[in-house]
């Protein structure tokens, strides 16, 4: 037996023994997510990475799993105990499939922890909202359930995605999220910390984007913060991002240099082609960019994970022997609970719950009424219930009418003058003289250039498969070939094909339709959409036959906004808004059910309907959960984990990542919104009373009483928000610091205890580069949402008094308090392996608050002027103390020390570095 196989030894010692037995080539074979086998040591081939956003994900119908609600829906439950149960299910089902295929399935990718400061992000459904405390609590519970409670072994190892500031899709492989140390530590990092320090996450995936100029997989804080402070196990790159460092980020000229930067900054495993990684490793070694010790550190980190999974320990690891099943009745029951708990009642004038009399009819109308869509990170459920069928199972088929509300169109070719018809094999030909059943298509128009045509004759989507054919069961693949991009052209329509490169749909000489390179629109490229049926009018006619309408609108999670594509706006598709107007005029008793991956701007819609119920694409139990909620058998209590804005006009540019300076998210934005963070209604009412506080070691204990003053049992999500009233720096207007979902029977009272841990109140002190608890006055507000505050009290809490900046020590420019200037920002220096401040040729200013000036007569400024000469002026408040001219430099990172003579000044004032011209500043230090 090899020493590394001795289960009586500490795992770290066993890993070191294994490394001692490996050859250099064998170690290099373990640097990618496809870890090569080492037969002589009985080490199997191993794959890192199985998706787990909504439970175990296999897109193979032969591998069914329990499909949870979308993560943004799970977050809306505000129920960590439920998250833990869901994590256990995901972990157990991963173990089940790992026993069938032992080389994979246990190193999981998920949950997605990126804070969602902008609802237009294409992957909003994957995240847990905009608040880092909520994200941390919910994902800590989910990952703990996946990992298990054993002190030595892990059921699975979840990897948090995507560290960090990954909240846009456009140009994600090359763009830079411009962030500051405060926004990183207080917002973007903080969201990840909970699942690592207090949860079960032992791995992390670096994001595609850059962080103020440095690719996220080379961020030095992967080592300094994630590993050294949080003690995370290992870090992987996102898919193909290792090679993208050269090909897209252009961070380095060679893959060897990129690998060296990744390894030295804490990234251990490259999610990339193993041959490319191997070649880069040998090149880096030959050039002296890395040592074998660098490889040992990375390989040891990921191999420690494999040891913790019990790969080498047989029955000594309890997770190798515990029962593991998939899609069990217990799993289904927990999943139904999750689907019901994430039902969020946004608006209700009293029509809900529905009070149906015997024989009354319900019309389910709308494009989401008979669908149960999957997004990309979704497994295959063994069953699925849509909203129409959920109601029919409870009310009877004859009592539930249905219409999808889609327009029916025919597509006429300008070239042939004929209509597109569906042949027996599904191929489309522009050859029909008249419109019959084979020429009719349901027009699924999702707006923003995303349309599908659904053939009425065979219930198949039109897809591009060489020629265009009506043969697709559903739009579901990485590339959506059913995607048509309509564009008006005079009185005709042009269709772009699904490809990201410009391609047109054009009629060929044989009458078939093909995708051809984009060119000037000729007759072959022009079509007319001829209306056959007006879907809104048809739906309105059906609505008149019903006593109540359940109008189901929302998004298709594989189109418009998803991975690779951000949402251009917050509006519902135009066809759906037309449908709402027609149906509610036909029947005022219209309940709007929004089935969506993200929030919409529903301001005008809310004025038109008596109730709005929101659900995410909630998995197999969607229809059951909606039906139970509409009928009053489930009392909704979910809360919005992300703000619903009135329109996109209320949002800054999607690339604005500095939430503090830009007043982004509910933390800093005090403007009017549609539904605030934490909003959610109930079928009953609750009263709050008796808020008290008691200081404890490590935090503050709050107690209050919640009374159910209505006639229905229900859950209430009690939320506690904090505000620092006397802080040295700009702090949030409100920040969630504790919450609890409690069940309160009608007419009864429930005591609620909330503990606010100190870490929830800390902020990042840029003067000393650490998170601190600041001494001072704090307001604590308890309520049903961030805007519905019921009780409040103030406390003086112990902590640190933030000292004045010590100008006698180096002051890094990145640690400014405020800045001004059109392009004043931070960038990253590979030479310094740190960030620096820079301006464009219009100049700018960096301000360092409350600096201690002690009659200094000189300063040393490390700066560069990468174009023409620039000038840096040093101020104490409004008083200029001195200036220095920076001569032209070789590059923005060509820092040199420049001596500045100063007028003596004593006292505490803001240090201002006013820059005239294009310049870079790394640090400044004052002296005699």
Give the role of each language-model region.
Residues 501, 769, 774-776, 907:
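A glycine-anchored, Pro-Gly-centered beta-turn/N-cap motif
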Residues 777-779, 786-790, 794-928:
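Extracytoplasmic
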Residues 721, 735-737, 769-771, 810-812:
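Short intrinsically disordered coil segments
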Residues 753-771, 900-903:
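Short, hydrophobic beta-strand segments
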Residues 1-763, 777-782, 786, 878, ...:
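Glycoside hydrolase catalytic-domain context in secreted enzymes
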Residues 451-453, 494, 677, 695, ...:
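Residues embedded in well-ordered secondary-structure elements
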